UniProtKB/Swiss-Prot annotation:
PTM description: Phosphorylated by CheA. Phosphorylation of the N-terminal regulatory domain activates the methylesterase activity.
GO biological process, one term: chemotaxis
Protein name: Protein-glutamate methylesterase/protein-glutamine glutaminase
Gene: cheB
SUPFAM superfamilies attached to this UniProt entry: CheY-like, Methylesterase CheB, C-terminal domain
Length: 349
């Protein structure tokens, strides 16, 4: 099996050694170099041609965001960001996801030392996954966000609709593409699960809200879901939807993680399967693994459901869409830029 060559970029000598040592323990990973700042990183990427780069968000000389943008422009390669869990760190990390980073690892917030071992397996796993990412999808130019004027409201709509989106690796960029193309008068609420730890989902929702014509917010337990609003599942809890008093409400579920994920797409989709008097549109986009497929099977069995999967050519990682497609539970397969139009069309039918 091919060895994956990794460049480690961090201004801390301790962190460079720690990341290098941990990655080198895996038989498929070879650390071919390290860099202390963004300028050094760009030189070493050009010279060494790594398969994956780990990149600190906060660095002197050239920070992680500026470095990332230069990497994706000049030497496109899968990048895993290494970030702090501070509010500023989370905001910068979300920006990095939308500039083309494949994924990120949050540094432990406690004292350095044994806390670092908590993210060792996550670091190794995300670097391995990043090596399989579709770099063309990360660097593809994105359509300009539309300025909405026409109304998409249908003349008669006898039944409430709800849109549920599940995504993982590469998801923040995919969510931006879809949510910024939805009209503000969308005749359905949107609920979305993005695999992401607590704290980072707040920054994700805030950034998407600033860009989209619809309202985007982090979901709150017990709130009534409103048309024209997208609700992002908070990290650390499962998001479910319940029908209560004739309204659709967001609820939190603290049951154990599913396949390592909380929130999990399967849990959201399964909760929607119990809602009978509502048309359901499920969307599965880029992500590693198969989260969402089991829940989508239950959704389809419950009836009144249409499912959209992102096409291979635009998915950063095709795992989640492929699993759903191969299970035979998908109605529409479209590239990322066409998902919003497909959602609007299905709501209007």
């Amino acid at each position: 099996m091919k060895t994956i060559k990794v460049l480690v970029v961090d201004d801390s000598a301790f962190m460079r050694k720690w990341i290098s040592d941990f990655l080198s323990e895996h038989p498929r990973l070879e650390v071919i170099g390290t860099a202390r700042n963004g300028r050094e990183a760009l030189e070493k990427i050009a010279a060494l041609r790594p398969d994956v780069v780990t990149l600190d968000v906060e660095m002197p000389v050239m920070n992680g965001l500026e470095t990332l943008q230069r990497i994706m422009r000049d030497h496109p390669v899968p990048v895993v960001m290494v970030s702090s869990t501070t509010t500023e760190g989370a905001e910068n990390t979300i920006a990095a996801m939308q500039y083309g980073a494949v994924d990120f690892v949050a540094k432990p917030s406690g004292p350095i030392s044994l806390d670092l071992y908590k993210v060792k397996d996550e670091m190794i796993g995300k670097v391995l996954h990043a090596s399989e990412a579709n770099v063309a999808a990360l660097t593809a130019p994105r359509r300009q966000h539309p300025s909405w004027r026409p109304s998409f409201k249908a003349a008669a709509r006898p039944q409430q609709a709800i849109v549920a989106i599940g995504t993982s690796t590469g998801g923040p960029r995919a969510l931006e593409t879809v949510l910024t193309q939805l009209p503000p008068d969308l005749a359905a609420p949107v609920v979305a699960v993005q695999h992401m730890p607590k704290g980072f989902t707040t920054s994700l929702a805030n950034r998407l809200d600033a860009l989209a014509a619809i309202t985007v917010k982090e979901a709150e337990d017990g709130e009534v879901l409103q048309n024209g609003t997208a609700y992002i599942a908070p990290g650390g809890v499962h998001l479910i939807v319940r029908e209560e008093g004739g309204a659709l409400k967001a609820r939190f579920d603290e049951s154990p993680p599913r396949a390592g994920h909380r929130p999990a797409v399967d849990v959201l989709f399964e909760s929607l399967a119990a809602i009978r008097l509502c048309r359901k549109i499920a969307v599965i986009m880029t992500g590693m693994g198969s989260d969402g497929t089991a829940g989508l099977k239950k959704l389809k069995e419950s009836g009144n459901t249409k499912a959209i999967a992102e096409a291979r050519e635009t998915a950063v990682v095709f795992g989640m869409p492929r699993a759903a497609i191969e299970a035979g539970v998908v109605d529409v397969i479209v590239p990322l830029d066409s998902i919003a139009a497909a959602i609007v069309q299905l709501i209007g039918e």
